[in-house]
UniProtKB/Swiss-Prot annotation:
Comp. bias (Basic and acidic residues): 208-232
Region (Disordered): 208-237
One of the Pfam families matching this protein, by short name: MMU163
Protein name: Uncharacterized protein YGR053C
Source taxon at top rank: Eukaryota
InterPro entries, sorted: Mug163-like
Length: 283
């Protein structure tokens, strides 16, 4: 009994004498825990499973492409955040990539508000953030199902570079005339079906092809694809797309919850059409 009292008194005295040390230590521990969750489970499995509610602040802020598309409204609150992120997950999983795709993390960077490292300070200034709290920057890309999620970061990056070299300047998707953003921002008030997205993707891909090479050969390949079975064609269409992007998480003061989630630099690589979008594809 005496030992318990001494231990309790000791803990209380540590908190009382070194409140700042205790607070900073707890923040570091929380940062490690939430980073571990997002890197190991949260982001890789996001298409299959929503972030757990316990890591979301009640007043969480959701920002879509604030640097390249500042006109897109910012969402506030856990309910709106979850509804909109679920809408995005559904679009990507059902219409763009496929149910089996995961998000592979290519880089993770922690940006602490108290860091004295010049590189970290420079990185803090380069990201379009809205708080002075600690941050986590995660760059990711979707996997390729036929490789059973075994494709490496280097292989993916090499393929992206190869596609970009072959496409020159590429082309950007303009989201102003497409109902995808409206659906994401207001999923309960808008309807979106597969034909809308499929038609948009095909038309946007065609508009983005500035240099058509070997049209005869391409037409023969298209004719061959038309003769393939519907199942095979559907599978090929799924496997032909790869999405990459950046998540920026800003945490609360205790580093226990996500206060701001920003999505930036999303690109769609369409291997059949050989195009690369520049940060404007909102899926």
């Amino acid at each position: 009994m005496l030992l318990k009292c001494v231990c309790r008194a000791g803990i209380i005295s540590i908190k009382g004498i070194f409140p700042r040390w205790y607070s900073n230590s707890q923040k570091v521990a929380n940062l490690g825990q939430i980073t571990d969750y997002l890197v190991v489970k949260g982001v890789p499995n996001l298409l299959q499973k929503m972030f757990k509610e316990s890591v979301l602040a009640d007043n969480v802020v959701f920002r879509l492409f604030p640097t390249s598309h500042p006109y897109i409204p910012v969402l506030h609150g856990k309910s709106k955040y979850m509804a909109s992120l679920n809408a995005m997950r559904m679009i990507v999983r059902k219409f763009i990539l496929g149910d089996e795709c995961r998000l592979h993390i290519s880089s993770v960077k922690t940006l602490t508000s108290t860091s004295h490292d010049e590189e970290v300070k420079s990185a803090l200034q380069s990201y379009n953030t809205i708080t002075c709290n600690d941050k986590l920057v995660i760059k990711w890309q979707s996997c390729i199902p036929e490789d059973h999620c075994k494709i490496t970061k280097l292989e993916i990056n090499d393929r992206l570079k190869e596609e970009k070299r072959g496409n020159g300047a590429g082309g950007s998707f303009s989201m102003r005339s497409v109902p995808v953003i409206d659906y994401i921002l207001h999923p309960t008030a808008n309807n979106l079906n597969q034909s809308v997205i499929s038609e948009y993707l095909e038309n946007a891909a065609e508009r983005s092809m500035e240099n058509k090479v070997n049209e005869t050969q391409n037409s023969k390949e298209d004719e061959k694809k038309k003769n393939d079975g519907d199942g095979k064609r559907s599978k090929k269409k799924r496997l032909s797309r790869l999405i990459k992007g950046t998540f920026i998480f800003e945490f609360n003061e205790e580093n226990s919850k996500i206060l701001v989630h920003t999505i930036e630099d999303v690109e769609l690589i369409h291997y059949e059409k050989k195009i690369a979008t520049r940060g404007a594809f909102a899926c």
